[in-house]
């Protein structure tokens, strides 16, 4: 790969940073050598009703996996995100809402949000929702989604947020698995100018005869287009809050009481309901938010994630609100109505901290300077990346173009199951390398092991595991602790297995190489797909690439690359040869793609992740069972790829 140089900590950042390099090392050493002392102190970042005496009580032992933090303490999450800020910053903005339509935006203060949450919490009680009941939330990106989540937390109900892009079948499956008692939705959502039929999807989902627990559907009016209405079951949000009291004392919750279930796709079988509890999760979300984004009071923070993903839970809502931050919620997409929308939103709201995904960055990068046309983005101080490894070229483009070459990028590695950041730079403490997640956060003990579980010391590559618990860790899979142990703790005994591979360089920095099932073995050489993709995307004519392995009778696996070119570029035989030589030059002959498949679009989930499972099957010609495609943003892409594959005559 291209020569990696370090980006030093900018002086302007170092002067005001919350954590400097010395503090990072000191805190980190304390956090791994004496976790009780470290977390005992830092657990105080939030307010406790009954303070904890026990800090950590955890085991990764086979057959006895048990994770408990602050287990004798009590608290309420909503009180931490709202009530405790009222005296000092009740009139400060809590949420800036930017609509899909650039002419629509509004602000919600902490006082207003508190009022709305208390009111809606009383609505939930009136509908028969009790502490411990599960509430399904299938909402667009509007402040009311946050109100619904916080209202659940206020009364001790468990929320299960379902991303607004999921199909009726996916919604039904999640309602059944979690035994939800209520659904909260909207008539429609709006995204990139198009209406999303949320209520219609819920109606469809509830036709499933296995759903018997739902008595009511609360409907928020977003567009005014609700087609079907079932009297007695469906109730309007605005009607319910009319006479609801605004007085709702927060429920006292044990630290280990469930807070939310969030479904994540497994590599096999049905989605897994990842369960997070209240105390450890909020401590971890708040602490990671504060230090990783170097958040200072008054900063305007924008996380582009949907509330339906863990990033939306931890870093759009709970982490920021627990810290009394100003958080921007965006209904739209970064390239609508124009490709410079991201920059326009930054300028309009004077955003200081931006947190987005490589898939968005690459989409803008393909547009070149059009993506920043007419925008200044000078308010930005810190930028972040989440969702998948960011290739160095996209990192540099993001750094130079969006951030005007002055904003540190926090490239965060974490998962739904981890609750918060695991490996990440800290702006005032970490020199950066493009494409590296750098070093572990406090209390996180990563290790690299070979396939037999032997630790790899020094600069090495291997399976990424975590050797001890941290407060934000998921406690179980809802209703299936056996699957929890099987999935995360059975591959390498006594360790949490992330499912990702990584390499550690001579500076101790971690580089995520992609899912372990995305590792190619070509003639006995291990190659991470992320590395080959980075090489491809560094070619000036390539916008996006996805690499998979296909069976090869001599090499074991051949390298099959799906490639999307920048606008205005056309595939030619010359370019085919040029691209193969380019990768050979960047990585070496062993990494040269055997087959290039030109395509306009890749199959992505609605959170922007490329569905490699489908790409592997298409590449191998195994199209009999492509599995569940309901989570794809555009299921039509699959047929298009199959047609392209049929008509392809790969040059020999």
From Swiss-Prot:
| InterPro entries cross-referenced by the UniProt entry | Ac_CoA_lig, ACAS_N, AMP-bd_C, AMP-bd_C_sf, AMP-binding_CS, AMP-dep_synth/lig_dom, ANL_N_sf
Residues recorded as bearing N6-acetyllysine in the entry: 609
Q: Which GO terms describe its biological process?
A: acetyl-CoA biosynthetic process from acetate; chemotaxis
The keyword Transmembrane is assigned to this record: no
Concerning PTM, the database record says: Acetylated. Deacetylation by the SIR2-homolog deacetylase activates the enzyme.
Detail which positions bind Mg(2+).
537, 539, 542
| KW Ligase (keyword) present | yes
Enzyme Commission (EC) number = 6.2.1.1
UniProt binding sites for CoA: 191-194, 311, 335, 523, 584
Tell me which UniProt keywords the record has, alphabetically. Acetylation, ATP-binding, Ligase, Magnesium, Metal-binding, Nucleotide-binding
Give an example GO molecular function.
ATP binding
Q: Which reaction does it catalyse?
A: acetate + ATP + CoA = acetyl-CoA + AMP + diphosphate
Superkingdom per UniProt: Bacteria
Cofactors required: Mg(2+)
Binding residues for ATP: 387-389, 411-416, 500, 515, 526
Gene Ontology CC, one term: cytosol
Biological function: Catalyzes the conversion of acetate into acetyl-CoA (AcCoA), an essential intermediate at the junction of anabolic and catabolic pathways. Acs undergoes a two-step reaction. In the first half reaction, Acs combines acetate with ATP to form acetyl-adenylate (AcAMP) intermediate. In the second half reaction, it can then transfer the acetyl group from AcAMP to the sulfhydryl group of CoA, forming the product AcCoA.
Q: Which family does it belong to?
A: Belongs to the ATP-dependent AMP-binding enzyme family.
This chain belongs to which protein, by name?
Acetyl-coenzyme A synthetase
Q: What is the lineage of its organism?
A: Bacteria, Pseudomonadati, Pseudomonadota, Gammaproteobacteria, Enterobacterales
Q: Which gene encodes it?
A: acs
């Amino acid at each position: 790969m291209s020569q990696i140089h370090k980006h030093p900590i900018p002086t302007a950042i170092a002067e005001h940073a919350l954590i400097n390099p010395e503090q990072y090392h000191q805190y980190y050493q304390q956090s791994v050598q004496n976790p009780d002392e470290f977390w005992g102190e830092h657990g105080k970042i939030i307010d406790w009703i009954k303070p904890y005496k026990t800090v950590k009580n955890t085991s990764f032992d086979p057959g006895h996996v048990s994770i408990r933090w602050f287990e004798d303490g009590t608290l309420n999450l909503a009180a931490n995100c709202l009530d405790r800020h009222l005296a000092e910053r009740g009139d400060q903005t809590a949420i800036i809402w930017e609509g899909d339509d650039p002419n629509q935006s509004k602000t919600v203060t902490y006082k207003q949000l508190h009022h709305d949450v208390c009111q809606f919490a009383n609505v939930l009680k009136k509908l028969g929702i009790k502490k411990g009941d599960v509430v399904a939330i299938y909402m667009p990106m509007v402040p009311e989604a946050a109100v619904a989540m916080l209202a659940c937390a206020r009364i001790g109900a468990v929320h299960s947020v379902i991303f607004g892009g999921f199909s009726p079948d996916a919604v039904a499956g999640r309602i059944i698995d979690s035994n939800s008692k209520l659904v909260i939705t909207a008539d429609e959502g709006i995204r990139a100018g198009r209406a999303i039929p949320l209520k219609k999807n819920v109606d469809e989902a509830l036709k499933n005869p296995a759903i018997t627990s739902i008595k009511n559907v609360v409907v928020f009016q977003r567009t005014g287009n609700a087609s079907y209405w079932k009297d007695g079951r469906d109730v309007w949000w605005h009607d319910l809050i009319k006479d609801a009291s605004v007085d709702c004392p927060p429920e006292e919750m044990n630290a280990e009481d469930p807070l939310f279930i969030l479904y994540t796709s497994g590599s096999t079988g049905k989605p897994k309901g990842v369960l997070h509890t209240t105390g450890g999760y909020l401590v971890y979300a708040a602490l990671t938010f504060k230090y990783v984004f170097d958040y200072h009071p008054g900063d305007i923070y924008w996380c582009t994630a949907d509330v339906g993903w863990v990033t939306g839970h931890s870093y759009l809502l709970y982490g920021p609100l627990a810290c009394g931050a100003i958080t921007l919620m965006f209904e739209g997409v970064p390239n609508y109505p124009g490709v410079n929308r991201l920059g326009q939103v930054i300028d309009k709201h004077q955003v200081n901290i931006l947190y987005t995904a490589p898939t968005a960055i690459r989409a803008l990068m393909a547009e070149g300077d059009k993506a920043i046309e007419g925008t200044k983005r000078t308010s930005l101080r810190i930028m972040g990346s989440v969702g998948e490894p960011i290739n160095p070229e996209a990192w540099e483009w993001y750094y130079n173009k969006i951030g005007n070459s002055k904003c540190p990028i926090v490239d965060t590695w974490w998962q739904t199951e981890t609750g918060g950041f695991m490996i990440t730079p800290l702006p005032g403490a970490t020199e950066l390398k493009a494409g590296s997640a750098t070093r572990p956060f406090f209390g996180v003990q990563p290790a690299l092991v070979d396939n037999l579980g032997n630790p790899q010391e020094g600069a090495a590559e291997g399976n990424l595991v975590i050797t001890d618990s941290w407060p934000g860790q998921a406690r179980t899979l809802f209703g299936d602790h056996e699957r929890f142990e099987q999935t995360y703790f059975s591959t390498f005994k006594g360790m949490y297995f992330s499912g990702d591979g990584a390499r550690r360089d001579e500076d101790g920095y971690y580089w995520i190489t992609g899912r372990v099932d995305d590792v190619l073995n070509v003639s006995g050489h291990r190659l991470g797909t992320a590395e080959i993709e980075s090489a491809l995307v560094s070619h000036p004519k390539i916008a996006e690439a996805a690499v998979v392995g296909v069976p090869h009778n001599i090499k074991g696996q051949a390298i099959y690359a799906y490639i999307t070119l920048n606008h205005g570029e056309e595939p030619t035989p010359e370019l085919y040869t040029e691209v193969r030589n380019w990768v050979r030059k960047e990585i070496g002959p062993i990494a040269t793609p055997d087959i290039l498949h030109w395509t306009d679009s890749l199959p992505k989930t609605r959170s922007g992740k490329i569905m490699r499972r489908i790409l592997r099957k298409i590449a191998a010609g195994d199209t009999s069972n492509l599995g569940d495609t309901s989570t794809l943003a555009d299921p039509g892409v699959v047929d298009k790829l199959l047609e392209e594959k049929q008509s392809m005559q790969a040059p020999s």
